[in-house]
């Protein structure tokens, strides 16, 4: 069990999880707000 915890806390595994989470978040944001690149943040 300790070996599994050590493996899951290594940088490639954490980076894969983080980038997957970030990609999913960006996909969902773009689904609800499709033209974010042309959206002005300076109201």
From Swiss-Prot:
Q: What Pfam families has UniProt attached to this entry?
A: PSI_PsaJ
Q: Which GO terms describe its cellular component?
A: chloroplast thylakoid membrane; photosystem I
- Report the main location listed first in the record: plastid
Membrane-topology annotation of the record: Single-pass membrane protein
Per the record, the GO terms for biological process are:
photosynthesis
Question: So where does this one cross the membrane?
Answer: 7-27
Gene3D superfamilies associated with the record: Single helix bin
Q: Which InterPro entries match?
A: PSI_PsaJ, PSI_PsaJ_sf
* Keywords attached to this entry: Chloroplast, Membrane, Photosynthesis, Photosystem I, Plastid, Thylakoid, Transmembrane, Transmembrane helix
Q: Does the keyword Plastid apply?
A: yes
- Which residues, if any, are the signal sequence? none
- Answer whether the UniProt record assigns the keyword Transmembrane to this protein: yes
Q: What does this protein do?
A: May help in the organization of the PsaE and PsaF subunits.
Protein family per UniProt: Belongs to the PsaJ family.
**Designated name of the protein:** Photosystem I reaction center subunit IX
Protein source organism? Gnetum parvifolium (Small-leaved jointfir)
């Amino acid at each position: 069990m300790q070996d599994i915890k050590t493996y899951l806390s290594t940088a490639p595994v954490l980076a894969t999880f983080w980038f997957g989470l970030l990609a999913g978040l960006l996909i969902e944001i773009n689904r609800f707000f499709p033209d974010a690149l042309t959206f002005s943040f300076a109201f």
